[in-house]
Amino acid sequence: MELLNTIVNEINNILWSYVLIIVLVGSGIYFTLSTRFVQLRLLPEMIRLLTDGVGTKTEGHAVSSFQAFCVSTASRVGVGNIAGVAIAIVTGGPGAVFWMWVIAFIGCATGFVESTLAQIYKLPRKNGSFHGGPAYYIKNALHQPGVAKLFAILISVTFGLIYCSVQANTIALSAQTAFNISPAITAGFLAVFTALVICGGVKRIARFTEFLVPIMAGLYILVAIIITVMNIDKVPGMLALIIHDAFSPQAAVGGGLGSAILTGVKRGLFSNEAGEGSVPNAAATADVTHPVKQGLIQSFGVYVDTWLVCSATAFIVLLTGQYTIGGELTGIALAQASLASIFGGFAPAAVSFMILMFAFSSIVGNYYYGEINIAFFESKSKAGLFLFRALVIFMVVFGSMAELSLVWNLADLFMGFLCLTNLYAIIRLYKYAHVALNSYLEQKNKGIAEPVFDPSVLPSESGIHAWGVDKD
């Protein structure tokens, strides 16, 4: 096992340190330029669409645009937003934060494209809901069913099973450290609560995340604001340090400027998931009048994840001054030490509570992606979905009590392949998202407040099964 873990880790180092960074950043820049900075010029529209979607009621089993946004944010905003950012600062220096911001800006364009495509090629269900994602547009638009099936299997295993076990493991370790609670007890509680949420189906998951995500992110950002206000005199110096170290040859341990850039880009990509092919699964479920609406909303999710939540961790760590570049104190422990310097002995419990919210929301969001891709195989029997739910609950229990280094490395490997497959698809299908964007803007320029999508504007209607058509 140790040999296998070493081999997988070496492959991951090459894949995530070089290949994927080049492809993800390159495609992000391409989408940014070709959409004429859609993530910047339509930022007010993103905010309008998101705020208009809050509290929107949908009929039957349909999912609102805000609920779909909350599901994807639940998956995005996980333990990595606390531990990952702390690790980035220790290994890449404060300058890594700047490069996380940059990659988030670029990734917004990629997120827009993949989510818009997911909406264009979504499939309707008899109960009035929708489902879709990369597996669906790979099959229906690229007409490569074999690749689509492989993608569906990989994302179901990676997100639905492996990532759920990793998040459960983090919750159990945090509870044991802060409250001396046995991992077995934590496993039992997690199994029960996970079952209650996921067995209620897509609509219950959407309602659960719609309730939890704003509270979860809001509380954490509030803590960061309190610390920022308490250290307001240090803020100009902190921002100057971030900018200076982002371009300083001595910025980080073991690689200087290159290390700062590489670390920031890697952590940014891991956190916001733009281009990885996960978020489109949630985007496709939204009931909207135009695909671009959900593309813009999901694009804004990248800002929320990195510019708000990840920045909150960065400010907490940098303003409290508990970090040492290249030091042993890192990850969750560094976040706890940073909060303890402000709030005292209450900090471990507070961090444990935040981890519980972040990690459990990720479990629910990750399961959601798995369920959507299980549905891709169109089995009339519910046995497959029942088995998948049972496996998810089992992996939550297993993850709470296991060492998961090999499992985590395998998940990263699978995610790398998912990412490359999705980028291949969205680059080839980009013209459809671009035409949809132009259609949306033309209607807005004519004074139409809520544009309606007409698939006839696309170069081809092949593979579209919603939007009033059903063509092969």
What is the predicted role of each segment?
Residues 1-79, 89-96, 428-472:
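N-terminal alpha-helical transmembrane segments of multi-pass membrane transport
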Residues 4, 34-39, 80-85, 161-172, ...:
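Transmembrane helix-loop junctions in multi-pass membrane proteins
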Residues 9-48, 90-128, 304-312, 413-423:
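Extracellular loop-to-transmembrane helix junctions
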Residues 23-30, 34-47, 169-175, 181-231, ...:
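Membrane-interface loop-to-helix entry segments
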Residues 27-32, 103-128, 134-198, 354-363:
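Helix-loop-helix module between adjacent transmembrane segments
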Residues 37-64, 87-89, 93-97, 109-142, ...:
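Flexible loop linkers connecting adjacent transmembrane helices
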Residues 57-91, 117-135, 139, 256-303:
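Alpha-helical membrane segments and immediately flanking helix-loop junctions
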Residues 114-122, 223-241, 249, 255, ...:
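Extracellular/periplasmic helix-exit of transmembrane alpha-helices
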